[in-house]
Design a protein with these regions (language model features):
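Acidic, S/T/G-rich, low-cysteine, solvent-exposed domains in lumenal/extracellular/periplasmic regions
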Residues: 59, 76-336
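Hydrophobic targeting/anchoring helices
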Residues: 1-90
Length: 336
């Protein structure tokens, strides 16, 4: 059941060993839709839930989100020691509650024609065709959301390190006035990091988990969290893990709206060793820098953008799926 539908067994209570499955689905032979079980099990609530599920079978009633995320590493490569890719199945599940979600690597250089929004998470080494797909979607007036950073995190027996990465989007973002700086933001306003610590007592040693101050887990909240945007509605705070600061200098006709910022006491660090640090008393040993300031972590850009590929031959000219339209300016919204 878990492999085919992704459903987990349930229990009546934490202390009940009996397990059961209680899910409701709709299936037309091609598409399986999970219908949320309403909290109040009334006929009216069930009817409403089923009607919402049926909307997914009618074209035009739900907006379509194209999600570009790293392809999962094959089991064979994992056995050969290849590092696992980031998994965004939970994000896909949340989006699927309200949108029609399509997973697309954009390798053919085009965004699906029915897309209303493109979300790019954790991009790594995007090629020219993939960037072209995003660029042309933006030129058509589409909305592009990019979640990226200057570093990838590698965990090994020797520690936790931030490794520089190339998303493939750096020149395209810079063309639109957004640069992801090669640094990490550290903030005294942060979420804790659980670290096992060995203590000695009465001739015995025992290990316990200690929640350490960890400035790389930035706790973003007002006034650093914009309260009046649809994307932040209902959010009181958000934790950003090992984020890089943004420098934003778009064209004059572009409207800039800061979405996420660190606190006034945050600072930048070029250190790539991001292991938690503990002093002799078992406390966090991070020392704030002298130069502290609020750092921009997320922005929204809106206006008329110029194509990154303007006055260039289409990268799809040698492709059987050639897009014969020339890159043009367009009106669009974009977030990075």
């Amino acid at each position: 059941i878990n492999a085919q539908y992704g459903f987990q067994p349930m229990a009546a209570s934490l202390f009940d060993d009996s397990r059961f499955y209680f899910y409701l689905t709709l299936n037309d032979g091609q598409t399986l839709v999970q219908v949320p079980i309403p909290e109040a099990l009334s006929a009216e609530n069930f009817q409403r839930a089923i009607e919402e599920g049926l909307k997914r079978y009618a074209s035009g009633l739900l907006k379509t989100v194209v999600l570009h995320a790293p392809a999962p590493v094959s089991p064979y490569l994992s056995q050969q020691g290849a590092p696992p890719s980031q998994q965004f199945t939970q994000l896909q599940g949340f989006l699927s509650d309200d949108f029609e979600v399509t997973i697309d690597q954009l390798e053919n250089g085009q965004v699906p024609a029915n897309a209303d929004l493109v979300i790019v998470v954790d991009p790594d080494g995007l090629d020219e065709r993939q960037v072209f797909a995003l660029d042309q979607f933006l030129m058509r007036g589409g909305t592009v959301v990019v979640s990226s950073g200057a570093f990838a995190v590698q965990t090994s027996q020797s520690g936790i390190n931030a490794v520089p990465r190339n998303s493939g989007l750096e020149p395209w973002l810079a063309h639109h006035g957004v640069s992801i700086e090669s640094a990490l933001v550290m903030d005294p306003q942060n979420a804790a990091f659980p670290v096992p610590v060995t203590r000695q007592a009465g001739g015995f040693s025992f290990q316990e988990l200690v929640m350490l101050d960890y400035p790389y887990f930035i706790d973003v909240r007002a006034p650093g969290l914009h309260p009046e945007l649809p994307i932040t509605t209902g959010l009181s705070q958000i934790t950003m893990s090992r984020a890089s600061p943004l420098t934003v200098q778009p064209a004059e006709n572009i409207l800039i709206t800061p979405i996420l910022s660190s606190s006034l006491n945050s600072w930048r660090s070029s250190q790539t060793n991001v292991m938690p640090r503990i002093d002799e008393q078992g406390l966090s040993a991070f020392v704030p820098a002298d130069d502290t300031a609020r750092q921009t972590l997320g922005v929204a850009l809106q206006g008329r953008f110029e194509s990154y590929f303007a006055n260039q031959a289409s990268v799809l000219l040698n492709s059987p799926t050639t897009n014969k339209s020339d890159p043009q300016d367009g009106n669009a919204n974009s977030s990075a």
